[in-house]
């Protein structure tokens, strides 16, 4: 942890979803990409081989469609339809969602909430999909708002939007901290100029995350709570 950094001292916290709050033990979101592309464009396209961890749904779609030979102009024109279809697909299959909470995440969120902290989701998921995951995991009531992919595409844009929303509620001087599980979360937080806590509950190890110099790095929420102020 950076010397002098009190991880729970910020006014608001932006939490990534996948790998930070929960890990999905289902393929609903995964198949929604393929099925939505097939429905809208009539082509078979897989997300296999496309980096997904730390990416955004729009970023993943763009990479898949570029690989299939589409130009950005064509992608941009069809994205709204594909996004709508993806959300509808996950909505239809919401009962199959099987999120597994990361260690001590409820206790961590409650620790912050009882101290009056404003909590937000800040995720590369499409908004409908992100909220459905949190709802199925039982976490939805803990978050005041969220910032998601589409029309935003870059993770830094998603974080900046979340910061803006937090400061609209709390005032322009409100302090905000990001909590995530990937190097992309760390890098995006640096771009927007806020502290970042990395938790190694996704695919990246503690050492891999620590190499990107977050303000604090922990193996899981249990360890984070041990350093609560």
Short names for language-model regions:
Residues 48-49, 53, 76-80, 140-154:
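A short, structured active-site edge motif that brings together acidic residues
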Residues 178-219:
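Acidic, Mg2+-coordinating phosphoryl-transfer loop and its flanking beta/alpha structural elements
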């Amino acid at each position: 942890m950076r010397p002098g950094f009190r991880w729970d001292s910020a006014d608001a916290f932006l939490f990534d979803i996948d790998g930070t709050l929960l890990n999905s033990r289902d393929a609903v979101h995964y198949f929604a990409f393929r099925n939505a592309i097939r429905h809208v464009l009539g082509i078979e396209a897989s997300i296999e081989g496309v980096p997904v961890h730390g990416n955004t749904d729009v970023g993943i779609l763009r990479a898949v469609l570029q690989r299939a030979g589409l130009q950005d102009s064509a992608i941009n024109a069809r994205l709204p339809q594909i996004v709508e279809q993806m959300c509808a697909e996950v909505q239809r299959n919401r009962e199959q969602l099987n999120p597994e909470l990361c260690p001590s995440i409820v206790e961590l969120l409650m620790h912050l909430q009882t101290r009056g902290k404003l909590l937000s989701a800040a995720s590369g998921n499409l908004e409908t999909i992100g909220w459905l995951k949190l709802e199925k995991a039982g976490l939805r009531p803990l978050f005041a708002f969220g910032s998601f992919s589409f029309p935003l595409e870059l993770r830094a844009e998603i974080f900046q939007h979340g910061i803006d929303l937090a400061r609209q509620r709390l005032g322009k001087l409100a302090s905000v901290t990001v909590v995530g599980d990937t190097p992309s979360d760390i890098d995006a937080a640096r771009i927007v100029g806020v502290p970042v806590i990395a938790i190694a509950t996704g695919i990246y190890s503690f050492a891999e995350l620590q190499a990107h110099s977050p303000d604090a790095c922990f193996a899981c929420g249990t360890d984070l709570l041990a350093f609560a102020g």
